Design a protein with these regions (language model features):
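Structured mid-to-C-terminal alpha-helical surface segments
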Residues: 1-151
């Protein structure tokens, strides 16, 4: 049974909602629409929160995968992360606390192996390489990141 107290629901957007086109064409149906969604930086901000709060290696994979494929505004991601941490009633951890949290998780085989069965064969993924990249991109910047307000 799902513990509903542990599920988070956000009904706001730090960066504003956006619309993305969506289209389906096949023998059964053809159509298009626009889907209301979040900016990538906002999604990565919530993923960074998940990386800190959950013991799921897939969060590390998701951060690494997105960052290596699309240019991302790191400061916007960190701004969103802080907002979502505060929304959940939590104080954003310091860089030292985040590093300690990650070191504990990286010592757990179940954390490191979490994503393996979800990846298609041939997908190249190294937990150590991904952590080094995400750490350098985000965690190391927590101590120096400037918090800017939404305009």
């Amino acid at each position: 049974m799902i513990d509903r107290a542990s599920i988070t629901y956000e009904h706001f957007s730090e960066l504003g909602f956006m619309k993305m086109p969506f289209m389906v064409e096949n023998a059964w149906f053809s159509g298009s629409c626009e889907i209301k969604t979040y900016a990538l930086e906002e999604l990565l901000g919530t993923k960074l929160r998940a990386l800190y709060q959950r013991k799921k290696g897939r969060d590390l994979f998701d951060m690494d995968y997105a960052m290596k494929r699309v240019e991302v505004d790191i400061d916007a991601v960190l701004r969103c992360w802080r907002r979502y941490m505060a929304h959940g009633g939590k104080t954003a951890p310091t860089a030292k606390e985040f590093l300690s949290n990650m070191e504990e998780k990286l010592a757990l085989p179940e954390y490191c192996d979490d994503v393996k069965l979800m990846l298609r064969p041939g997908t190249d993924f190294s937990v150590d390489t991904a952590y080094s990249f995400v750490k350098g991109s985000f965690i190391d910047r927590l101590a120096t990141a400037v918090v800017t307000k939404k305009v």
